């Protein structure tokens, strides 16, 4: 079974993401552009999958192939035929139906039978000596939980000791959303075809996709002529946002940031946000907080300028700062409410996080100059819905947040989504399970705030900040693991990713 604590992605993954619905409708156009039939395209998919499975699991000798009643099953028939011709023992189980197979899948099925293949009922016991499972049960058209008979087969496959290799997408994972409304194949490897689908990168995807691989099936040129609606971002994108500094840059030109928060007992939150902003390159960072927090914060991080939060200090700081971050440790009592009331009408770039979002949910408004960074619980409060609704379609939730609150939205979680009022959308393909601990959001707010202060536009600052944050955590996890990771541990690796021109970054 794959250890899913870390994201597993092969190096060849593209940076464009496409709706599965759009792709299904465009497949024939794509095939026509190369003079291919859909069956020939299916053969390419099967050949790519067989080749990768053979390379990945060279010692396997008995493959169990699970075929559904659609084109995903057709891919499975092609893989089975190629494996059989290569001398691999193959047991093929197929879900039958009263409905006819798609024409190209029927051709693949007939080719399997003509090659001497046998189709077994899915009700039989899975062969104990199978050492690789090929999952071709359900494809990208799935929009609900698998039917009971298919769910039972999925659960049997998951209990089998052999690893699973998913064709296009693990059966039971929704291609548009990454949701898993029912049983789902827990794949060790997934090979997706033609284009990346959103559901492979967000939601529950990381729990079930395993190592994600990609094959364009020869359609690269056609795909380049299409406009991708979603971008996938990882550490390779950092140089496009974070250029080397000019030798004459100084603390004033590197941006002035004010951070507001840290009510009683939450000095740690504001301290982490402040240090993260410094580590991400802000020239000057001022913190407005409770009087009791001033000495501990200055002692812990003397580079911070720390002042008591008063009416006068807020007004003066709003004039002084290039960018405002409010929310970490702010609380929801009168102290925090009054601070937010003073800040909310500023026309300067702002980032609202944590308790600022909880207060925003009570009094919603729309601002073009604001980034909000909710986790799923905060997003649910902002949209007055259940967390399960957020997680069932994270892309839709991000879109709804942008429409209601304006500006730019960072919907945090595994497969963070960044969406803007200009219809930009990015999936952040870094990060790991070690980031599920207190303070990670405070660090992210400081990083994004610092990049805003360095004159990145809100969408770019949000994307670059999320990538640097997650990449720093990935670098740390590679050396010490994910369990026990602290938010402040990221400071030891963050500088490498906000300086992507350094040659010491490990890209493995």
Where are these regions (language model features)?
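Conserved acidic functional residues
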Residues: 27, 135, 166-168, 351-354
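Glycine-rich, charge-decorated loop segments at or immediately adjacent to ligand/cofactor-binding or catalytic sites
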Residues: 103, 171-185, 357-367
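Small-residue (G/A/S/T)-rich helix-start motifs and N-terminal tracts that mark the onset
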Residues: 2-94, 102, 189, 200-352, ...
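Short, conserved catalytic or adaptor-binding loops enriched in Gly and charged residues
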Residues: 109-114, 183-184, 204-207, 401
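Internal gly/pro-rich beta-alpha loop/helix module
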Residues: 130-132, 137-228
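N-terminal small/polar loop signature for handling phosphorylated ligands or for N-terminal nucleophile
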Residues: 78-159, 295-309, 315-316, 320
